Amino acid sequence: MGRGMQKQRFCLDTSAFTEPSVRKALGVKTVTELTDKVMDLIAEARIKLNISCHIPYPTVYNELMGFLENENCPRDVIVKVDTWLVKKTPNRYEIKIPSEIFYEYVKDLRERINKGMRIGEEHIIKATDMVYELSKKHPEMGKNEIINKVLSKTINTFRNKYRSALRVGTLDSAPDLDVLLLAKELDAAVVASDGGIEKWAQRLGLRFVDASDFPFMLEEYLKHNDRHLRIKY
């Protein structure tokens, strides 16, 4: 067992097992295949280096299970997840978060809500103008036809802009928050590919590891551990 690694802990978000760039780098196509490979690395790192990997339960764990079940994941991969990932519910009543962090989050959320409202207003005005212009140019078109034509052009743009304003770069779900709380409780590094989780992990002074780097980090740890053992013996 490697020394100096006893305190290495990681708290994993669902994206640690679903990140497309990691699948491509490891030569796998599905979430199941990536989970299988990552779990093998986690198991080896646990045995050789005492590195422990944790997953918030039930929120993030259930998210991961949902992805795996959708792919009809084999039972042996589920067993690996249940064996090598430490499932734990964050102690939400005992974890202390500075009030300044809470203030920043509420301020950020308020700004996003206001931005979302402006985007909604802009698209309502735009849609109204389009309906007016279409009804003038094509008086033969029926009401429903005009509405459907306008919505098909504006709804996707609105959704993308609204989603970006409200969700990108912030915490927008209970699982996201649980990853940070559990990492804070355990003094663990956060593993994710979510910009919001990364941003607030930095605010909380937590170590952050991008999900796309995590498997290769474990491989590097294990490679140097094996080299050390060869030199030693």
Curated annotation (Swiss-Prot):
The keyword Hydrolase applies. Its EC number is 3.1.26.5. Pfam families: PIN_5 (PF08745). InterPro entries: RNA_free_RNase_P (IPR014856). This is RNA-free ribonuclease P. The keyword tRNA processing applies. Belongs to the HARP family. It is an enzyme of class 3 (hydrolase). PANTHER family: RNA-FREE RIBONUCLEASE P, UPF0278 PROTEIN TK1425. One of its GO terms (molecular function) is ribonuclease P activity.
